[in-house]
């Protein structure tokens, strides 16, 4: 995996995957899409879709654990704080050899800079929430979210997927 290349790709994902509008029905459709993908692939994950301060969709796929729920919460907090994907923040910290605690004073008990939480952005409004998956390796969590966003927004996933391992 090339960190710089992944960061460039994530920036394109974040710029491209923008909703024209977002409401509870869209959140349900997005969460349901993620659940369908997870069930079809046998992924034991937690799925959380929320605007900041308001949960709109939550589901566990059989085999997901309370740890997955906590990781989803902590990754979502990173999106709420930085308005960027948790994977992008984690990769930037990895490049710098730093942690959220030492660079930003954010406690690990509340924030996790691992892949899987992605900003929900609305045209003309900016980032208004997050969609999070937890249960796979972090790159897999991130890509599952991106794939579902592509499906919901009508983008070809192959053009936005991260490349390499």
Swiss-Prot record:
Which family does the record assign?
A: Belongs to the UPF0303 family.
Q: Which Pfam families match?
A: HbpS-like (PF03928)
Q: What is this protein called?
A: UPF0303 protein BMA1246
- Species source reads Burkholderia mallei (strain ATCC 23344)
The cross-references to HAMAP family, in alphabetical order and at most eight, read:
UPF0303
């Amino acid at each position: 995996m090339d960190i710089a290349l992944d960061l460039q790709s994530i920036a394109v994902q974040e710029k491209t995957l923008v909703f024209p509008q977002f409401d509870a029905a869209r959140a349900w459709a997005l969460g349901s899409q993620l659940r369908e993908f997870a069930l079809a692939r046998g992924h034991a994950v937690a799925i959380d879709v929320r605007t900041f301060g308001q949960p709109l969709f939550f589901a566990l796929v059989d085999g997901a654990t309370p740890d997955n729920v906590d990781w989803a919460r902590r990754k979502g907090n990173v999106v709420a704080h930085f308005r960027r994907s948790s994977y992008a923040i984690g990769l930037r910290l990895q490049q710098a050899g730093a942690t959220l605690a030492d660079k930003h004073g954010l406690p690990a008990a509340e924030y996790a800079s691992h892949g899987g939480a992605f900003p929900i952005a609305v045209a003309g409004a900016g980032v208004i929430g997050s969609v999070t998956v937890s249960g796979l390796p972090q790159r897999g969590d991130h890509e599952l979210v991106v794939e579902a966003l592509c499906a919901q927004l009508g983008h070809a996933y192959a053009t936005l997927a991260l490349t390499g391992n």
